[in-house]
């Protein structure tokens, strides 16, 4: 491998930081919401009595490594008729405070070129009446700060200021140091007057905010963002804390309730540690500085000394109490200017002078590494390192806190951050488990009315109840254990002098997390297809990952593509299309919610299959039975489309020359299209139906001569008439694609886009349907795209143009309404000769679709498929801009004709934002008729979205207003797709492959699809460490550990070496101390077998380890039995005894054989060999039938004779501890914990294990693997600084020191700890048959990516493009992608390696550029757009491993 590409395939999911604030709306927007009056409510009725609701809800902002996401919190209140109509919305958590569901909805998602170190929300201030919005402050290493605000006009975040304190000008801030233990830490003043960022250990950067009305925020700015103003940073300056005689700053926070901003800083005067505590213990100090940002003065106004050395976090107490809480490992302290108090948490707590006794809590707890937030002004919620939730109550009189009171609540996930969301919710962000949104309710009074503390198994968790909830969309899931498990109750202990508060909790939503990935195995799926080849074969496999920690530990089964569960299949050659239709002979006359529920569960009646020259009709009752001969459907030729009209009372079937309206199997009406001279063959051929779009009661037909016909249905008579829209008839412009969009519901969404539309369309008129009940028909629009690339939206049936945009096909980032001049058609015609006409022709839109899925807050999506296979995806949003009206007025004065047709109801406020779809699908259409590729679905196993057919088909599903794309590669190309709901296939689907096989399937119910890849979580309730795969019996052996409480004397006796005759020295311990329990980790090997039904996996065997023995490695190895001459597949386990520091290290190697199929199922594995060795056995591997073991600092090669291992060779160089060992043929690669990598070879002739070369630098390795590119062998290694390096062995090159030194081939900063590499063969594209392997890797952030070899021509092309994209694309938060990818060496001097890896995270921006910019960039680097896109698609296809 000389050149490679770095490609992310699954982005980080472990949440590190979270915050809440009013980012997309202001506090006044939330508090002044006018209740929506439903059409069923009486307008004259009085306003309902106010009841305790959930209050105004801010946004939730989360970061996971380099991912930034902003969510809006949606609450469904009881009695909201629109919500209750949908029976699927049975929310988790039950009803609390009048709210029966709360969910997170994505506003924006960004992949940054840098890892977010800390995050804060800068408040606008100004109380409840403030119309201002908050801003987000992000910090990045080493000292970069970005301030972002939400801009309504582009529906995205935009940067308002950047502050960088790096480079030569700021070198003095580092004071000679090169590395710092943590990145910048940001905190903000609660009133939004300033912010503070701690960088380089002791430099405090003060960010002064601009006050509203000052010069910086001008009137123009306010208008351009829709009249809203966000908090902004005006200037910054630095306070050097060293000048204030501070030495080791641990944390800082801004206090509430001061006229000027006040910072309290927690610092340690002199370092101490556990071994010195008896001599130096209370070493921490608090200092409160009053910040005057105008005069740049910061006097100390109060301070506190003698805080414990293990103090680590500050929490500012809200008004009216004020002051600060100091969290320590064994105590909690409260300090303010006038008062202080403390609380001891366990027996290790001590006061500074040891004379006075600290008040103690009712139970013992360790509070190191806790996170906290406030759920009321006097109650803090603390999340401990074990996942327990504690409630800390401040008991106060006036503003003086008298004492602290700690009570236990329930246990939850192990949190990495926690934030309050409004006054009724909090968000627990987790790197080790799913992140949770929890609602709480506080009641004053006795806690007796509450069920009180429950048992341990009824905690609030994000996992453990997956099986059932996954059948529904992520925001409508339910739980197997029900609401009981999700509530957790806690109360303060009964004390007479405090008003007692009791809290109840309910989990409302969760974000799935697959991190941290410690290890993974690559195994066959249960439903694998043994005959698959090429890309289809890849989808036979799945990744089984060790993720999570402690009680959040789980196996995550990841699959990059979906493999449906097949019910049945039949051969059906020559199929062109399939449709399912409903039919009810009699329709009820009540259009209430029960009818809607019935509609949801109504079975399909007929399946219509279009073949080459005929049509088949099947009845979809209990069995699929063909009824082609006995129905009035048109069966003599192929069908173009079929669907339901008139509320499912009729079926329309459209074929090339006509259409039929059917009531069940009987025809009511037949229409014929085509030329007026139907006798002449050529005439009728000239105009046949090309594509069809149905929106009850209209049917839109596009003919082969590019004309448009509209079939208008009459619901009273259930008949249809043909009309030709005059607007389109008279136009010379050729139409390339068109579709109908039904804007359904009681509040059609697009009506909000027009200021006058409320008057013109009448608000919520109750239209009496034919069925007799009020029916909300909504509005219907026709979306048309022309050959020139322009797009127009017309209302139906009057065909007034309500929205138009030119150059739609070029894929601009934002679309807004701009009238198209008639000249535009002529201009485009002339310009086609000048530009590369082939590229322009290929960007013709061949298919359009517009859809708004069900949900109270959903917005429409607009999809377009271009002739070159590009898929454009736009999400609609509203922006009432002042500028848009100005622009419209000026245009109408220039060209009155452009606006006169539309009247006054143009969709002025409608805008579209282009969003990326993570698809690698790109297939050009031939010049013939493009088949329809997009099929919408509203309920397939509870999911909604669309299916994309073609050569690389896939599913696009909607979760939280976010589209998730999952490919389906198992059947190759798919020709047709439709939904099917009947007795045997509940909410399933049918598709036909290009090979002519019709399959009836369902979606696998066990997978969670609201993730970058479909994932199934198998809870272990223990920490998984390593996993391997035994292919023959499809078993997964893995190492797990779980905490066990043991008496202290047992633990101490296990720490001494019994064989050496050592005695336990416990004379200084009392008998009470020895009876106390101590928690230790116990290890075992579990052997799991996947369940066929997708349910929980079965544990086939457990192999416990001995006391204080840790299992370090488990691998399936193939050894040659020297006695029989046969190969044996064995399970090898390496362990280490973790004992006292005086005991010599030792470990065991264990070999197990797998039972034969005929054996008793009890004996899945049998121990065949066990041996104790000096040193820890940290890695094992098999090489040419021998077993390679790393035992402490030795590498020993063993021969197996069936009963014992015999050492035949060893390597005794100075590796300290081998973390990774890989074998290819006779070559061995070792990764050491500190001494970088070693490259060895094994020669069987002389039984030699010899060192070929090594890296002479020191490097803390995490994972290693061989990278194979044809005949070239390279060595890849990941390290503790989040880099990846690729080395090669070149003994003939002079700089390799006669071959002893490995040379650098590439280096790259990943930005995450890579914990495991896996070498997988790439799918070769076309004629290129080079044997190439890519490295798939997993990280501790929950992300997956790969390093894939490239040939030089491709690399040079992509590298040139990458350099151009650095400047051509605006980067979120102003981060430089090249700087992010530079190798990090933590200040160590080193020679930089070659730049031979391209970054696909930057290259993927190319596809999102408008066509003109894509062509210009390609021209600048001397290539074509086609070549660049082909390279990117080939790379995606080649690395579709799962």
From Swiss-Prot:
Q: Which residues cross the membrane?
A: none
What are its GO cellular component terms? Answer: nucleus
Q: Show the GO MF annotations.
A: RNA binding
**InterPro entries, per this entry?**
Beta-prop_RSE1/DDB1/CPSF1_1st, Cleavage/polyA-sp_fac_asu_C, RSE1/DDB1/CFT1/CPSF1, WD40/YVTN_repeat-like_dom_sf
Major place of localization? Answer: nucleus
Swiss-Prot/TrEMBL keywords: mRNA processing, Nucleus, RNA-binding
Q: Please provide the Gene Ontology terms (biological process) for this protein.
A: mRNA processing
**Where in the cell is the protein located?**
Nucleus
Q: Name one Pfam family in it.
A: Beta-prop_RSE1_1st
Quote the subunit structure annotation.
Component of the CPSF complex, at least composed of CPSF160, CPSF100, CPSF73-I, CPSF73-II, CPSF30, FY and FIPS5. Forms a complex with cleavage and polyadenylation specificity factor (CPSF) subunits FY, CPSF30, CPSF73-I, CPSF 73-II and CPSF100.
Family membership noted in the UniProt record = Belongs to the CPSF1 family.
Stated role: CPSF plays a key role in pre-mRNA 3'-end formation, recognizing the AAUAAA signal sequence and interacting with poly(A)polymerase and other factors to bring about cleavage and poly(A) addition. This subunit is involved in the RNA recognition step of the polyadenylation reaction.
Supply the name of the protein: Cleavage and polyadenylation specificity factor subunit 1
